[in-house]
Every structure is written in C-alpha cells, then in structure tokens.
Amino acid sequence: MDGIKYAVFTEKSLRLLGKNQYTFNVESGFTKTEIKHWVELFFGVKVVAVNSHRLPGKGRRMGPILGHTMHYRRMIITLQPGYSIPLLDREKN
C-alpha cells in the first residue's frame, strides 16, 4: 500500500515501542480508519488506538524562488497486548 511511507525512529518513537506503540509517517490524505484497517490486514495484529498529527512542510529556497516541501501525517498506532510488529521489534533492543 502506498499510504504508509515509512516507520519513524526518533527518541520518542523508540520510547513508545516499550508501550507497544508504533510510529509511521503516512500520506496526508489517509484517515485513521483506513490506516487501522491496513495495519491490521497487512501485519496481522489487533489495533487498539490510532493517534495522528499533521506535520507542516518546510520552506526551501532555490535561489530567488521560495518553495516548500509537502506536509505529511504521523500516526502513532497502539497494539493490543500480546501483539507486535516483528520487523520493528529489532529496534527495541
């Protein structure tokens, strides 16, 4: 699916891995329900909650022209106890 861009590994997201919460950057047009359904289907896990916030784009200057990068949405997905996403668990250790 093209909706999820990549997993995020910041200090906060690594701390949230201990609480069984995973952080992803997704396309800004997707809703919480769509991402929840896709994560449950693709990873075979049970999602308890989905929190999201929209990150602003950054300004970029190329000579006299001022441009910007696109904004995106970050989703924090909480899984039911006993479930995990195996590819991201290696980052916990």
From Swiss-Prot:
Key words of the record: Chloroplast, Plastid, Ribonucleoprotein, Ribosomal protein, RNA-binding, rRNA-binding
InterPro entries: Nucleotide-bd_a/b_plait_sf, Ribosomal_uL23-like, Ribosomal_uL23/eL15/eS24_sf, Ribosomal_uL23_CS
Pfam families: Ribosomal_L23
One of the protein's GO biological processes: translation
GO terms assigned for molecular function: rRNA binding; structural constituent of ribosome
Entry GO terms, CC: chloroplast; cytosolic large ribosomal subunit; plastid
Places the protein is found: Plastid, Chloroplast
PANTHER family referenced in this protein's UniProt entry, alphabetically: 60S RIBOSOMAL PROTEIN L23A
Its job: Binds to 23S rRNA.
Family as reported in the entry's similarity comment: Belongs to the universal ribosomal protein uL23 family.
Subunit structure: Part of the 50S ribosomal subunit.
Protein name per Swiss-Prot or TrEMBL: Large ribosomal subunit protein uL23cz/uL23cy
Organism: Oryza sativa subsp. japonica
